Amino acid sequence: MKIREATEQDFERIWPIFREIVAAGETYAYARDTTKEQALRIWIEVPRKTFVVEEAGNTLGTYYIKTNQQGPGDHVCNCGYMVSSTARGRGLATAMCEHSQDVAKKLGYKAMQFNFVAATNDGAVRLWNSLGFVTVGCLPKAFNHPSKGFVDALVMYKWLET
């Protein structure tokens, strides 16, 4: 398994992962019918950097890193992670989150924040907690889950400096 920086050409292999996860509507606050062009902007063009996880020529996962706020908040980054349904349970999200923290430090970020974690995404919440993230806020009924209705969204944060 290899994590490397993505190029725009990688988007053809990222798109099926993005489409599957976003269309499910269970974890990301993107429109379930997000177009390929919109997804390219969200995942490749806007972020500071995007990465892919590859194995035997297959793209198994991806993440982006970007500045969360401008000005006085520009020392805090935000990341988004996606793992192909065929590769879940293999530690890719852990590997990507650990990799992203190293990248964040190299880019000069002091902290990482996840802005809108669906509280029903138990696996992600457990993983982020195990990697040192704390829930610093709860947005009541802010996420409209397709089968569970309005559920809480969490703001999770980790100071990266030791």
Task: Show which residues each predicted segment covers.
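A short beta-loop-alpha structural element at the N-terminal edge
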Residues: 2-14
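Acetyl-CoA-dependent GNAT
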Residues: 27, 31-86, 97-98, 103, ...
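Conserved acetyl-CoA-binding loop-helix of GNAT-fold acetyltransferases
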Residues: 89-104, 125-130
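Helix-loop element at the rim of GNAT/NAT acetyltransferase active sites that forms part
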Residues: 15-33
